[in-house]
């Protein structure tokens, strides 16, 4: 939650203190870099590794959906599994969709309503971060209770719904509908990170989790091109609708990957 909440807060502060002139961002970035370094340096002293006898508390509460405990899989073995690559492609696709939306968010608001103040635009765009923060908790609980398939498909479905809502917002020039689209988009993107961690542990075990999980997170190297592609599409067509159709296409790839993993699970069972 700190990731999303911090993004919203820093975005507002950045908008307030950064000069409008060319290169005004340099001082703001320098200050942010110093502050981040100081916070990390101080907080690092409060982290203590658990002892060898530490045992995580048992899960309490209602009914949960879980697959049989996975045997510990080494990173090399994981890279040979079809389920890993299907999930990896899913993570790339939906992460790229989220980054494409975030990179074009302020422009989407301006195109829907050109008379918005800069502070208002920052607040509206910040809703993506807020919903990203809240949604991570919701999706973490959802994976525990309903399992991988529903969690992945809900992310896919929310991205498609986000694009449909934003296409409607562009056609009507409605900031209110843009806000709804950003709320949905933030929730959609929020499901990626908790699903990454839960999937890694459920399918490849806890023994090599410290290496396996970062390997899954390397999807962001490729997903980062989502913002580049969406920017190129806007430059070519002068409309953000192309970005929304890109997001729909990426979500469709995600649907196929999730269904393929389900098919492999059924064969394995």
Pin down the residues of each PLM region:
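C-terminal transmembrane helical hairpin of 12-TM major facilitator-type secondary transporters
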Residues: 97, 120-199
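Transmembrane alpha-helical cores of Major Facilitator Superfamily
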Residues: 1, 92, 126-130, 157, ...
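Flexible cytoplasmic inter-helical loops of multi-pass small-molecule transporters
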Residues: 49-72, 268-269
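A late C-terminal transmembrane helix in Major Facilitator Superfamily
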Residues: 3, 189, 203-237
């Amino acid at each position: 939650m700190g990731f999303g909440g911090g993004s919203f807060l820093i975005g507002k502060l950045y908008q307030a203190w950064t000069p409008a002139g060319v290169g005004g961002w340099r001082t703001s970035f320098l200050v942010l870099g110093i502050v981040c370094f100081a916070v990390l340096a101080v907080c690092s002293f409060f982290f203590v590794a658990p002892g060898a006898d530490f045992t995580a508390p048992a899960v309490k509460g209602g009914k949960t959906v879980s697959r049989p405990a996975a045997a510990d899989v080494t990173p090399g073995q994981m890279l040979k599994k079809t389920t890993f690559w299907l999930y990896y492609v899913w993570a790339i696709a939906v992460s790229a969709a989220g980054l494409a939306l975030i990179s074009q968010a302020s422009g989407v608001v301006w195109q829907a309503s050109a008379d918005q103040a800069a502070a208002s635009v920052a607040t509206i765009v910040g809703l993506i971060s807020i919903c990203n923060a809240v949604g991570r908790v919701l999706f973490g609980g959802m994976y525990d209770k309903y399992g991988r398939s529903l969690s992945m498909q809900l992310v896919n479905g929310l991205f498609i719904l986000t694009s449909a809502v934003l296409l409607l917002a562009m056609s009507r020039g409605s900031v209110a509908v843009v806000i709804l689209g950003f709320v949905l988009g933030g929730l959609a993107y929020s499901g990626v990170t908790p699903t990454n961690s839960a999937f890694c542990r459920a399918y490849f075990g806890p023994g090599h989790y410290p290496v396996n999980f970062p390997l899954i997170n390397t999807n962001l190297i490729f997903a980062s091109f989502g913002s580049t592609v969406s920017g190129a599409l806007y430059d070519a067509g002068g409309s953000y609708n192309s970005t929304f159709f890109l997001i729909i296409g990426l979500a469709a790839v995600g649907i196929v990957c999730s269904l393929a993993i389900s098919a492999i699970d059924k064969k394995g069972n």
